């Protein structure tokens, strides 16, 4: 599938219709539930491709730290995936009024964790827009505003952010919205 990219500040944003488990990046993001039980959606695909050790590390994390709150993150190894890390985030569920703030917190925690881990490349799914039912239009608007705020004066190791989804129409909507930042 075709891919497009834009550069904003010092970071390259790539938009790709692809399987996140095949991305050759330092870290991939998993849209998880708070107990890090990776059964369906992106989470299930990550464990199927990366191996049970990802689930075992997730179970260990929850046993030690408790459930991950909405907007929070947990980091595990990536098992057999090409990535080094999986950053699990608990994204918005459904269309509740607090969902936008949950997504903003996810993004902030993902990118701050990436900075702490000296990650240069990261791949993200469209968190919450699949089995969790968060509306794509709201996702696009929150991500657009977040990127504008966070990456305008960004200084850190991150060079490449890949947004990927198996649905090319979802990726196209996100890319078109983010291209507006460059043009404004």
Language-model features: locations:
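Phosphate/ribose-phosphate-bearing ligand recognition and processing surfaces
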Residues: 93-184
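Glycine-/small-residue-enriched capping loops at alpha/beta junctions
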Residues: 1-116
């Amino acid at each position: 599938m075709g891919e497009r990219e834009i550069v904003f500040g010092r970071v390259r944003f790539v938009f790709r219709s692809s399987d996140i488990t095949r991305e050759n990046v330092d870290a991939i993001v998993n849209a998880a539930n708070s107990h890090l039980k990776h059964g369906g959606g992106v989470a299930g695909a990550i464990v199927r491709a990366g191996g049970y050790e990802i689930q075992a590390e997730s179970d260990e994390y929850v046993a030690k730290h408790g459930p991950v709150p909405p907007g929070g993150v947990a980091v595990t190894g990536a098992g057999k995936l090409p990535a080094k890390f999986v950053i699990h985030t608990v994204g918005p569920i459904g269309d509740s009024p607090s969902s936008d703030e949950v997504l903003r917190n996810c993004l902030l925690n993902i990118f701050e964790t990436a900075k702490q881990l000296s990650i240069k490349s990261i791949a993200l799914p469209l968190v919450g827009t699949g089995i969790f039912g968060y509306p794509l239009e709201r996702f696009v608007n929150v991500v657009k505003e977040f990127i504008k705020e966070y990456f305008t004066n960004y200084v850190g190791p991150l060079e490449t952010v890949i947004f990927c989804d198996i649905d090319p129409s979802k990726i196209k909507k996100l890319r078109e919205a983010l291209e507006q930042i460059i043009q404004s």
